[in-house]
Amino acid sequence: MRAITFEAPIPRYLVTLAAGKVANAFHVGAHACTRYREVAAPDLPSGDWVRIRTRLGGICGSDLGIVALEASPSASPFSSFPFVIGHENVGQIAELGSEARDFAVGERVTVNPLLCCEPRAMTPPCEACAAGHHSRCTHFTDGALPPGMLLGTTRSLGGSWGEEFVAHRSQLVRVPDAMTDAQAVLTEPFACCVHAAYGSMPAAGETVLVIGAGTMGLLMIAALHALAPKAVVTVLARHPFQAAHAMQLGASRAVPGRGDYLAELADAGRARLLKPILGPPIGVGGFDRTYVCAGGSRGIEDALRFTRSGGHVVLLGNVSHARVDWTPLWLKELTIGGTLAYGSHVHGAASVNAFEEAAHLIASGRAPVGGLVTHQFPLADYRKAIATARARGGSEAVKVAFKF
């Protein structure tokens, strides 16, 4: 099958690193760590697994970080090489293992890509998985599979940047007939935002800032609009087309994230700006809760400076190497936390699985996110697809996906 793979032996890594500094185009190719090539289709690891023929495979910001060698080495123990890239997916079941008969060949599914205890045949499950906190699994490097936290970072299973991949029956979520492939492929990134919302849910009337209006920022707005509709959401959006999407999805206000935006951001958060001897101003007052969905160091600093004293900051953006002045964290007694992937949450008297809830919100129309898949490319046009995803300002891309 044709697929886009990643492997990083030292000579190839050094060549890619040097060439990529000349031009981004050199991050992919015959001599790069990321290559488009023919690979063997993955085998079913056991009877509990199914083979899935990919229909759409999304390009995630973390995938672009892998291609550009920007991912932190701290995450490397949770991968095994070579792997087929891609964890955002929708596909069609092509083969069933002997123990997966509750599904049918031909069914459309989207796959929760976490490779936690159940796919790894770990019994008993770890404490985190037993409690439904699958993103906190302590066995991502153990059990019946090679090391890897996700589909698309693990050798021998494939990924959604390939024609086929395999998944454990516990990972499958059926796609209703009324749900388009474009909607379904957004289930995974939207589930991350649903997980973040349940982990730090705004109360009615709270003021909320979403920093970044790429895919994750826009999906975060959609999640908040569906789950906390009485929160007042402001988005810091770099490009006008992103601001337009944000307003359609439920934001109350969009602040342009270019040029001198701090005064307007302070106004939106009802903050008073104080100018230190050196550096950017700090806000007194501000937003009750901030979700950082982009921006690296700058996004984190804006969050710390414009969240009110005693407020909450949530990091979704997979920021790795960041230089940040952390003074506002203690000066304003902020609570800051990271969020990864998806899991289960107690909400009222019910337990909510964030991945399944994301699929339900999209299918029911409460999260009208299908229009965010703005570009689709055949896999052979991988160079153009990756370039389009990188150049959002010029291409006005939100979610770019490979179409099979």
Please provide the spans of the model-predicted regions:
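Glycine-rich beta-strand-centered segment in the early N-terminal region that forms part
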Residues: 40-57, 72-130, 174-178
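C-terminal substrate-binding/catalytic core of Rossmann-like NAD(P)-dependent dehydrogenases/reductases
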Residues: 267-280, 284, 323-373, 383-384
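Glycine-rich cofactor phosphate-binding loops and adjacent beta1-alpha1 units
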Residues: 6-9, 200-204, 210, 221, ...
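Mid-domain Rossmann-like dinucleotide-binding core that forms the NAD(H)/NADP(H) cofactor-binding site
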Residues: 172, 176-264
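C-terminal capping/lid region of NAD(P)-dependent oxidoreductase domains
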Residues: 1-7, 11-18, 280, 284, ...
